[in-house]
């Protein structure tokens, strides 16, 4: 099976993973410049990099100290490949340590820096072309470079960091102590663009049309004349996968829509009408509501919920596949963010993802995950490129476990109904207010908390519903949406008046991080 990163005619910049939970944002930013980019293990060898043939290499940040016994290293031959290298934070310290410089705890060189700092450019550099000599950057480091290797020179510093940017112009090796991939580094995108376009010589011609052509070729090569099953949830990811697979293999694709009793209001009928009718996908609808809810009865641990749903979902596929002939592959709408949030060898698992960590070991299918190198906004872009209508492409994201992870604690029919009805009201009012494109994701959660209220002349003791609405670009970081008060008031009033067993509404004003988008 041909991986995109191995295709010789595709320019790519690889990012070596040293453990920062958000280092995949580096790859995302580089893709914005029309250059394919993805993470690779820091254990990659120089020979493996030669085979990939990238035009640039980025060494990411990470939590380790380069002088520690268990520090993540690098194949020293990588520095002799003649490929431009950019080290970010830990990556800069690793370059320094490996090439003969010195790295010490920051207290010995200045001070630790966490947050925005002013970077002062002291020497002209291609990396900082067309950016100001003083600029705000995000620092997050407990170690500092005190001596730079031979052949390197100082490019920039800050009040507490004597070497905030260094370079070896002859070998095209650059190091920066700050994080250009986050928005708090005001000119971070310009710096990464300078590296990709002007230093690495990228053409900037990577597009979704390229992705479609390559994925179709890859799918056909992998599948051959065999059959594929796809689980449809009605969400953006599985819908885009369905259209892409149909384009690649036509009637070799059978879609299974598992109605597990955890869907949004009227979602089952909408899925069948939208994808089965308009796009002509071959869809088998399975009513598995009782099967799922019986297994979930009394389960309040979110990880157990995810595992149960992931396992049972595949077992339902097994049951349906046994009725078909020659089915060898299971397709999923796994995204790049799903894989990262489920943990890599260098990063801690935040939560097992329904498309990654919930699969049983005895699964009978081989997996196909056509979107697993894409971020959410890229999936929407892909949908448009495939000719899908905007109302489908911009459909609200919905997790594989469905409402199970939007009901805190044990699941009951009563709790599910409160979320279904309140979520429908929220989506309706957001659309009426013309905010459905401005707010990246929005949904309601049954918090499992009951509180005292008064309705009419009587005392109530009913559920508290939380509204979660966020703004984001790629789903890796997010801010809570500052919805107009009149819109929030209308939503709240409608929910408590129209939804049974609810008497209180709260608004979640937590960003990501520290919170995740979903509550469970």
Curated annotation (Swiss-Prot):
Residues 12-205 form the Glutamine amidotransferase type-1 domain. Keywords: ATP-binding, Glutamine amidotransferase, GMP biosynthesis, Ligase, Nucleotide-binding, Purine biosynthesis. It catalyses: XMP + L-glutamine + ATP + H2O = GMP + L-glutamate + AMP + diphosphate + 2 H(+). The active site is at 89 (nucleophile), 179, 181. Residues 206-395 form the GMPS ATP-PPase domain. ATP binds at residues 233-239. It is an enzyme of class 6 (ligase). One of its GO terms (cellular component) is cytosol. Pfam families: GATase, GMP_synt_C, NAD_synthase. Its EC number is 6.3.5.2. GO terms for molecular function: ATP binding; GMP synthase activity. Homodimer. PANTHER family: GMP SYNTHASE [GLUTAMINE-HYDROLYZING], GMP SYNTHASE-RELATED. This is GMP synthase [glutamine-hydrolyzing]. It comes from Streptococcus uberis (strain ATCC BAA-854 / 0140J). The gene is guaA.
């Amino acid at each position: 099976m041909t991986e995109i990163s191995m295709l010789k005619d595709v320019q790519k910049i690889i990012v070596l993973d040293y453990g920062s939970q958000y280092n995949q944002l580096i790859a995302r930013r580089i893709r914005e410049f029309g250059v394919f980019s993805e993470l690779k293990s820091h254990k990659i060898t120089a020979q493996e990099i030669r085979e990939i043939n990238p035009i640039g290499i980025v060494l990411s940040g990470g939590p380790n100290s380069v002088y520690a016994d268990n520090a993540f290293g690098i194949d020293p031959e990588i520095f002799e490949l003649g490929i431009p290298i950019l080290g970010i934070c830990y990556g800069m310290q690793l370059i320094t340590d490996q090439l003969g410089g010195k790295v010490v705890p920051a207290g010995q060189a200045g001070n630790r820096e966490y947050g925005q700092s002013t970077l002062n450019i002291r020497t002209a550099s291609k990396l900082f072309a067309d950016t100001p000599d003083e600029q705000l950057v995000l620092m997050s480091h407990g170690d500092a470079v005190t001596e730079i290797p031979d052949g390197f020179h100082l490019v920039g510093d800050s009040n507490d960091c004597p070497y905030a940017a260094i370079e070896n112009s002859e070998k095209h090796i650059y190091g920066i102590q700050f994080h250009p991939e986050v928005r708090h580094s005001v000119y971070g995108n310009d710096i990464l663009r300078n590296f990709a376009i002007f230093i690495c010589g990228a053409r900037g011609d990577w597009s979704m049309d390229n992705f479609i052509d390559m994925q179709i070729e890859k799918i056909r090569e992998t599948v051959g004349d065999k059959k594929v099953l796809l689980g449809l949830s009605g969400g953006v990811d599985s819908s885009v996968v369905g259209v892409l697979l149909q384009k690649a293999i036509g009637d070799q694709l059978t879609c299974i829509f598992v109605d597990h009793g955890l869907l949004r209001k009227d979602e089952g009928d909408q899925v069948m009408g939208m994808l089965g009718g308009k796009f002509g996908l071959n869809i088998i609808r399975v009513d598995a509501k009782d099967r799922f809810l019986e297994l979930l009865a009394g389960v309040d641990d979110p990880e157990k919920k995810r595992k149960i749903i992931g396992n049972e979902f595949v077992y339902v596929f097994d049951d349906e596949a046994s009725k078909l002939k020659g089915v060898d592959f299971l397709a999923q709408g796994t995204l790049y963010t799903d894989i990262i949030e489920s943990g890599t060898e260098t990063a801690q698992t935040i939560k097992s993802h329904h498309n990654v960590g919930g699969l049983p070991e005895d699964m009978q299918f081989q997996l196909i995950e056509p979107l697993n190198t894409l971020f959410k906004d890229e999936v929407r872009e892909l949908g448009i490129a495939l000719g899908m209508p905007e109302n489908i492409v911009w459909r609200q994201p919905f997790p594989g476990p469905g409402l199970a992870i939007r009901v805190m604690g044990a699941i009951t029919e009563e709790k599910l109904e409160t979320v279904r009805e309140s979520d429908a009201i929220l989506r309706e009012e957001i659309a009426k207010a013309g905010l459905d494109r401005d707010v990246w994701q929005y949904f309601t959660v049954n918090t499992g908390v009951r509180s005292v209220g008064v309705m009419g002349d009587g005392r109530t003791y009913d559920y508290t519903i939380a509204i979660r609405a966020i703004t984001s670009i790629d789903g890796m970081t997010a801010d809570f949406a500052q919805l107009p008060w009149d819109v929030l008031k209308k939503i709240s009033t409608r929910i408590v008046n129209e939804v049974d067993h609810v008497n209180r509404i709260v608004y979640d004003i937590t960003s990501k991080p520290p919170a995740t988008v979903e509550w469970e």
